[in-house]
Amino acid sequence: MKKVNWLVVIAGAIVGIAAVLLTVLGNPKNMGFCIACFLRDIAGACKLHGAAVVQYVRPEIIGLVLGSCIMALITGEWRSKGGSSPATRFVLGAFVMIGALAFLGCPLRMVIRLGGGDLNALVGLIGFTIGIFIGVQFTKRGFSLKRNYTLAVTEGSVLPALMIGLLILVIAVPSLFNSSEKGPGSMHANMYIALGIALIVGALAQRSRLCMVGGIRDGMMFGDFKLLYGFVAIFLVVLIGNLALDSFKLGFSGQPVAHSDHVWNLLGMLLVGWGSVLLGGCPLRQLILAGEGNGDSAIAVLGMIAGAAFAHNFGLAGAAATAEAAGGVGTNGRIAVILGIVVVLVISLANMPKKEAAKAE
């Protein structure tokens, strides 16, 4: 086993602290950070979907991208590059989002939910690991979305520039955006505090290469578990924080913004894990890479935003359990998750060396 990378551990611990702190400051329970949920909220705020309870310009997303961008510029790691199957990456990003919203959370929120005692997230983790395992099998056999290329500075600057523009608009003309009056979208920390925390997290994630998918993938492929230590650090810090705040609740029922539709929790996160391996990283990692100038990751993020809009406009997202209803994933969402798995399989086969694709078939 390789030595512990303490930068990854420290970054994971700080992400965990940030998640607990943001919840204390107003973010929904077990949702101090969630890339899928926050991109979904931004899509709603920008009127891309009409779900009134999940609409808010989340400064955490802006901060993650800009924190990564600033750190990459300081360290000389900012590079404008792209051109690696952008349309395919857009589609993968959309289906990763659909899978995440069936489960009600990205891989980062899955870990945060585990730290809060939500055992539904354990089911999600099983599906997530299975999805990564499947993706790794294709990767080992030569799956590739082909190389990227050095591009004009403007290409790599698109997502950071969009985030700066979004921040300026939400400060100067907040009436342009929808903002939830109830539900998860109405629960948020102070914008400037959340932005500051996310800038720090984005910078640390850039330096440490923190990735929820990468730790499991690298462990399976190379026996290298150093990124997994960040995953564990987030869990332990969130667990300790919840115990200290008396907000830890072990079980399946009564969990915040969650449901116990186990088959679809598992399959939703299987789709997320598999799709993320093909993209080269989890949704958090895609944001960080986009901040570094990676246009392909920016396309994946835009695909996620489009996927969030589709999920809520067409009833694909899971419904959280309440005292009155069990919640879960409806028929439309189930069809979308199965379709997503089929699409990801087709993409996996289509981007393997021809002899390997023939064997897999």
Predicted regions and their residues:
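Membrane-interfacial helix-loop segments of redox and metal-homeostasis proteins
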Residues: 1-361
